[in-house]
């Protein structure tokens, strides 16, 4: 697995390497693909299709009321888990008006019990207002706020201990992908989670290549599948075959109503973590219902 290197992102600057190196890498991955596919076909996550909507630092009381109304009116497939993550200050508004069909997540939480930590929100407080999920390790927390792998892993452990379910995010920067380090970066981030998590029942892994978040670029279905399969294989080797076969691995990075169906067809893509498109009720519903594409290929 260490010898494999991911294919470069679409429409990105060419990597600063000779063309022959890129060709060799692609050929090597292609020759290894059939064996990997045969090994992992039966290992795709066994839970329901999962779609999370990360609203980030967006919205007003008025716009969120409209979005919730759109979501309440949407017809969603029965075999998909749907979760939305409003900004902290709107969680209570969303919880009180959103259909029970859709669960609610926070976008972050503190590493431990509450106290003298100005500006932070504790897991206990989130549970107290009825929050069921939390997103941890998002690239904007890693690369804008400066949270490191160890800190994020400990956050995950504490959140789980307080009965929050966790969307655990991993993903590489553009320069890391171009340097052939995608797997190294993702596996390092996975190790920080694995070092702290003892029970994966309430964990969903979200692969979000940083170069595809909010950029309009999206990993091809083949690129996303390649990383998802590698992460599942890593789980089998480093955690357990049972976790590898049951945990859901979802994709995030400029997912929208137009590209979700093709991505959903891939064996190891168990759903999506959606950013901008989750702010548009009809588009988000379309993404949730892309589970029908998964049924076609099952």
UniProtKB/Swiss-Prot annotation:
Homodimer. It comes from Secale cereale (Rye). Belongs to the triosephosphate isomerase family. The modification Cysteine derivative is found at residue 186. HAMAP family: TIM_B. This is Triosephosphate isomerase, chloroplastic. It catalyses: D-glyceraldehyde 3-phosphate = dihydroxyacetone phosphate. Its EC number is 5.3.1.1. Keywords: Calvin cycle, Chloroplast, Isomerase, Plastid, Transit peptide.
